Amino acid sequence: VFEDGPKRDRRLWMGDLRLQALANYETYQMNDMVKGCLYLFAALPMQNGQVGACVFLEPEPEVDDTSMFDYSLLFVAALWDYYVETKDREALEDLWETAKMQIVLAQKQVGNDGVVKDCNKLGWCFLDWSLELNKQAGAQGVLLYAMKSAVAIAKEIGKDHDAECIMKTYELYRKAAKMHFYDEEKGLFVSGDCRQISYASQVWMILGDVVDEQSGIRILHDVATQTEAIEMITPYMYHYY
């Protein structure tokens, strides 16, 4: 499996897997290893069906007791990436219910206003290695991003009703994101009650298609001029930028 290096914890992390798999497709093309990792996460969910943030392999495969909002959702994106690369329809069909469950569980964290509820619990959502980063807007963006992949998967395997339902909800959440997080005066997305400006919030709102491509380009240029914007820290976050 893909795992953290010897100076880290040597676990298989879901968020990391998504990027490791993308790098693999362009280099070693060890696609069976990606497949094995996806099946491992699907086979070892948490009690409520959520994909765990990471799994241990020794002394025997076991899911950690840690879950993160964004990491679970990235299982959906990673599965769609894998299918686009391999056209492995059997795996897509096998793992669809796990992917769908991540969307269902994430929706439970969304309020009646169509916005992901903010949370003060440490580690509820990763995005980047930063304690000062407010993650509400970024979490909404990750949910939208994963929902797009879920719609694509459902359409591909003939789950038209699922695709229609997810797409309808996606549009509601996307409009809510624009209304709740976009500051017209600043021309940027803000996050949390503190209305924090960060690179992560801009990036994930753009990836969630809350704004069009030209607006996204303008936002990325503009956030770079904001001295108070919370910057990116990890190579992990820089990838999405």
Where are these regions (language model features)?
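Active-site core of glycosidic bond-cleaving carbohydrate-active enzymes
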Residues: 9-241
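Leucine-rich, amphipathic alpha-helical/linker segments
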Residues: 4-6
